[in-house]
UniProtKB/Swiss-Prot annotation:
The keyword Protein transport does not apply. This is Small ribosomal subunit protein uS7. InterPro entries: Ribosomal_uS7, Ribosomal_uS7_bac/org-type, Ribosomal_uS7_CS, Ribosomal_uS7_dom, Ribosomal_uS7_dom_sf. Gene3D superfamilies: Ribosomal protein S7 domain. It comes from Methylobacterium radiotolerans (strain ATCC 27329 / DSM 1819 / JCM 2831 / NBRC 15690 / NCIMB 10815 / 0-1).
Length: 156
């Protein structure tokens, strides 16, 4: 265990429109160079498009997308006697959420639509329906863990 102090968890203020803490984390991850108002405009714009297309509550679509993208298990490298094994381990809740947010944003940024608002809304709808690059990333992670199940006894 480290002798240094671990970083204190900061309290995150819920977003003003929907009152959701996870949505604030999502906005903070989208934000570039401290431009929070731009990040808010992107997210709220995407939510408006989701509401029009899906005829559903955008927060519920967002939560469904996060649940469908969040990995249950991942592989971690572990050195044993000169060989490096990919050992499957369960993902902690906080890391699951962080990975889901990161993968959703990466997938949205890699899409070919015109604006980030359109890309994000399309990726959220795809992820909520178990499609899209973010869900594919989770499936790849699970596949890697399944392929390396033989090394699960090296878990720490």
């Amino acid at each position: 265990m480290s002798r240094r102090h671990s970083a204190e968890k900061r309290e995150i203020i819920p977003d003003p429109k929907y009152g959701d803490v996870v949505l604030t984390k999502f906005m903070n991850s989208i934000m570039y160079e401290g431009k929070k108002s731009t990040a808010e405009r992107i997210v709220y714009g995407a939510f408006d498009i989701v509401e029009n297309r899906a005829r559903a509550n955008p927060i519920e679509v967002f939560r469904a997308a996060l649940d469908n993208v969040a990995p249950m298990i991942e592989v971690r490298s572990r050195r044993v006697g000169g060989a490096t094994y990919q050992v499957p381990v369960e993902v902690r809740t906080e890391r699951r959420q962080a990975l889901a947010i990161r993968w959703l944003i990466q997938a949205a940024r890699s899409r070919n639509d015109r604006t980030m608002v359109e890309r994000l809304s399309a990726e959220l709808l795809d992820a909520a329906n178990n499609r899209g690059n973010a869900v594919k990333k989770r499936e790849d992670t699970h596949r890697m863990a399944e392929a390396n199940r033989a090394f699960s006894h090296y878990r720490w």
